Amino acid sequence: MKPFNELVGKLSDAASRQALKSMHRGIEREALRIEKSGHLALDKHPKALGSALMHSRITTDYSESLLEFITPVFEDIDELVEDLTLTHAYSVRHLNGQRLWPVSMPCYLGDAGDIPIADYGSSNTGQMKRLYRKGLTYRYGAQMQIISGVHFNFSVSDQLWNRLYELSDTSLSLEEFISESYFGLIRNYRRLVWVLPYLFGASPALCSTFIQDPKTNEFPFEVIGNGTLYLPYATSLRMSDLGYTNQEQDNLNISYNSLACYLEGMKSAINMPSAKFAKIGVKVDGEYRQLNANILQIENEFYSPIRAKRVAKGNEKPSESLARAGVEYIEVRALDVNPYSAVGIEKSQIRFLDLFLLNCLLQPSPASDASEEAEIAANLQAVVLEGRKPGLKLTRAGEEVSLSGWLESLFGNLNDIAKLLDDEGQDDYQVALAKWQKAVNDPDATLSGQIIKGLKDNQIDHGDWVLQLAEQYHQELKGYPLSEAVTMRYEQDAQASLEKQARLEAEPSVSFDDFLADYFKA
């Protein structure tokens, strides 16, 4: 691949700049439903929001209480955020007095056994989705599963792929070139993934009620107010061992060096038995506890801060879609919910992500080895637990480097891309970049820095602060204008999804045992 500066130079003509700008994006935002008291809502998914199994925009994640709002794919950032906002605005009008919890880490939790697993109805597909979640509960506990995040889906235009293909000296087909380039992006993203929790990590503190596992006492927490625990320099406890972790997966070593390596690694992981999970049992006294006793029940259980994706056809598994036609887009999974936005993410973050991901695509991306993977993991853990610590050092290619120095050089490259994306007389990308550049040498300008400063300055408990935000955003979204036509569209979508689920459940089907056997036979 050509050096970054040379490639940027070759993309500076009008047609290439237009090809660069035509990115496709989608957002998935998770949010817990809570009662006005702040306690987790324990009732069923609201019927006015349709079928969680069939609705394209409003579904549930792990729990019946954990809503997920999904946008279609957009090229225009304003349209993307407007769509996400409309879905929120419609939904809050149908929560029967409940609110949305506007941060990643849950708070007022009673017994973890009361957290309701999502229910998708009586069809075999619906039962399988529920059983998968039941397996997650047995494996990792319910608490970890109701931590929420924001996923950002991203792809570049066909025009850009054609231009990059033309500029390359590859012997690959265009489809192979696209997949290998996306895997190059993924490798560079993993090298730089710590940047996202540094800037956008928004879970440096949590309620003491979340700490029910003795192992979490190993963290040197400090206290604000009555029951807020925090680490002074943390950025994202969601991405630490307190959040999404799976020690069983630590030894999978799935390679991102090519699509073929990735698919081979995933196939082996899916079929790898786990002695630990076998102890849970698969079907005990006639009742299923998990889909199987492998390290991964299904591919979705594999935790990674980024995924290669392709829209599935029919009942294809994710790896089958990728094997059929290569990588279509990538999914960024390292974003905390932004508590300063009613919809969990703001436009300046989206523009930063565009620049960050284009940089990951356009930079040379050598293959990664085990020592670099260890370096990547250590850098990420250092930043999520103490990313705002003055003088923090990370490791790059075996050399010690300061976090701020590494960020300075990255922002220089991002600025080159921002200039290509901003038309004459426009500066949206450069303004967004300048906003986050303040955080390079001022950790208080990061989201986590703003949160800790706010909690300390106001001597307020994290839970009380979040509850105030929940109320504020509820009122804002409730007052957000919804036209009659938009309201009718959401009502029709909800009704159509319920009817679609009813039709599926009415169809003749094989037994659930046979359905599962058939699914895993393929």
Curated annotation (Swiss-Prot):
Reaction(s) catalysed (UniProt annotation): L-cysteine + L-glutamate + ATP = gamma-L-glutamyl-L-cysteine + ADP + phosphate + H(+)
EC number: 6.3.2.2
Signal sequence annotation: none
Domain of life of the source: Bacteria
GO terms classed as biological process: glutathione biosynthetic process
Keywords, comma-separated and alphabetical: ATP-binding, Glutathione biosynthesis, Ligase, Nucleotide-binding
Molecular function GO terms recorded: ATP binding; glutamate-cysteine ligase activity; metal ion binding
Pathway: Sulfur metabolism; glutathione biosynthesis; glutathione from L-cysteine and L-glutamate: step 1/2
Keyword field contains tRNA processing: no
KW Ligase (keyword) present: yes
Enzyme class label: ligase
A GO CC annotation given for this chain: cytosol
Pfam families per UniProt: Glu_cys_ligase
NCBIfam families: glu_cys_ligase
Homology family: Belongs to the glutamate--cysteine ligase type 1 family. Type 1 subfamily.
Protein name listed in UniProt: Glutamate--cysteine ligase
